[in-house]
């Protein structure tokens, strides 16, 4: 007889919790310790690089941003951008697994297309991500663009995973995220909520503040992503307010679950209506003709194959092999006094931010 999916989930959560407790004892984790680059038991390593997590998050519903680019009204465009942001949060059955820490110079690069639920196609989009440094802190950068529409989403993520006794805190709230719309000469600066892995409850959730603030228009959004209580409450619930910058007057309240249905309350007439429901994903990657040796799929192929075979011993061996090779490369650079130069990103001297090298992206 097949086991019920909830039973399987509970058993998986027990195994995860047991592995975490064992790890805490073995390496004597201290409160607030950053474990991002720390060695992890093979059973806790997710079979994908954090670059894959970033790439899928921002690309899979990019058609919503393309639709936003056709909206002339500032307020309506902001609402459409908020819809997109609620789709970037990953629903993952292995949400408690730790993504692989990328090596310096690891890349992901592909064109992609999206479809909406009406079957309309949105083509000519491109995503590029690269892990540009490990010292003084690990930093991954990505750019998701559609040149035809004049849209670019940039993401600079200085990774940390902090051990907080009963949970891990993943600091995506400290990432620098912004979306540019050339058509409107407008940039939207975004603060994302924090990602938490609840050790003894066996799941991950986003909690804390989300903010979307444009540089020009007079509207902004403040949202609070709420943690699931031990008893009652809802998973993935948030409440957001759309306000005017000049007066802080609240115009709308948006509330619901980011993975389900959301409602909007108009403060002018106190009428509540349907706002948004996370759409199905119609997302197709088109890989380059030449897959670089630095691509995540190449760098971690051995580990991914071992995971798919259920061989944790081989999985750890493959992880160790890549890490040791990387140390040799780093030591050689130090010996020869060579500074690593990213392949696809350059640092803007004026803003001190990493940006996609427009002349070297393909």
Curated annotation (Swiss-Prot):
Any GO CC annotation of this UniProt entry: cytosol
Pfam families registered for this protein in UniProt: Oxysterol_BP (PF01237)
Coiled coil, from the record: none
MF terms (GO), sorted A to Z: sterol binding
Family in the record: Belongs to the OSBP family.
Protein name: Oxysterol-binding protein 5
Source organism of this protein record: Dictyostelium discoideum (Social amoeba)
């Amino acid at each position: 007889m097949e086991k019920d999916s909830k039973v399987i989930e509970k058993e998986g959560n027990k195994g995860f919790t047991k592995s975490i407790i064992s790890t805490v004892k073995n390496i004597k984790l201290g409160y607030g310790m950053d474990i991002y680059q720390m060695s992890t038991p093979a059973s806790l390593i997710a079979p994908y690089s954090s670059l894959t997590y970033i790439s899928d998050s921002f690309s899979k519903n990019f058609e919503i941003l393309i639709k936003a680019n056709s909206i002339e009204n500032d307020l309506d465009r902001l609402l459409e951008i908020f819809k997109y942001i609620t789709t970037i949060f990953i629903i993952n059955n292995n949400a408690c697994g730790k993504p692989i820490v990328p090596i310096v110079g690891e890349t992901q690069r592909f064109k992609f297309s999206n479809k909406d639920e009406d079957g309309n196609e949105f083509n000519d989009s491109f995503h590029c991500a690269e892990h540009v440094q490990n010292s003084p802190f690990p930093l991954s950068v990505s750019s998701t663009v559609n040149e035809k529409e004049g849209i670019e989403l940039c993401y600079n993520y200085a990774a940390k995973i902090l051990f907080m006794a009963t949970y891990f805190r993943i600091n995506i709230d400290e990432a620098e995220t912004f979306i540019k719309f050339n058509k409107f000469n407008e940039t939207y600066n975004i603060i994302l909520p924090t990602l938490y892995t609840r050790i003894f409850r066996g799941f991950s959730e986003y909690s804390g503040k989300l903010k979307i603030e444009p540089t020009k228009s007079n509207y902004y959004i403040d949202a609070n992503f709420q943690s699931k209580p031990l008893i009652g409450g809802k998973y993935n619930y948030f409440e957001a307010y759309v306000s005017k910058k000049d007066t802080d007057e609240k115009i709308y309240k948006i509330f619901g679950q980011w993975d389900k249905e959301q409602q909007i309350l108009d403060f002018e007439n106190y009428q509540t209506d349907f706002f948004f429901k996370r759409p199905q994903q119609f997302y197709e990657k088109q890989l380059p003709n030449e897959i670089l040796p630095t691509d995540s799929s190449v760098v971690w192929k051995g580990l991914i194959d071992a995971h798919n075979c259920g061989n944790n011993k081989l999985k750890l061996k493959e992880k160790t092999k890549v890490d040791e090779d990387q140390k040799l490369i780093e030591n050689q650079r130090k010996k020869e006094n060579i500074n690593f130069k990213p392949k696809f990103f350059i640092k803007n001297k004026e803003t001190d931010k990493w940006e996609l090298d427009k002349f070297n992206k393909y």
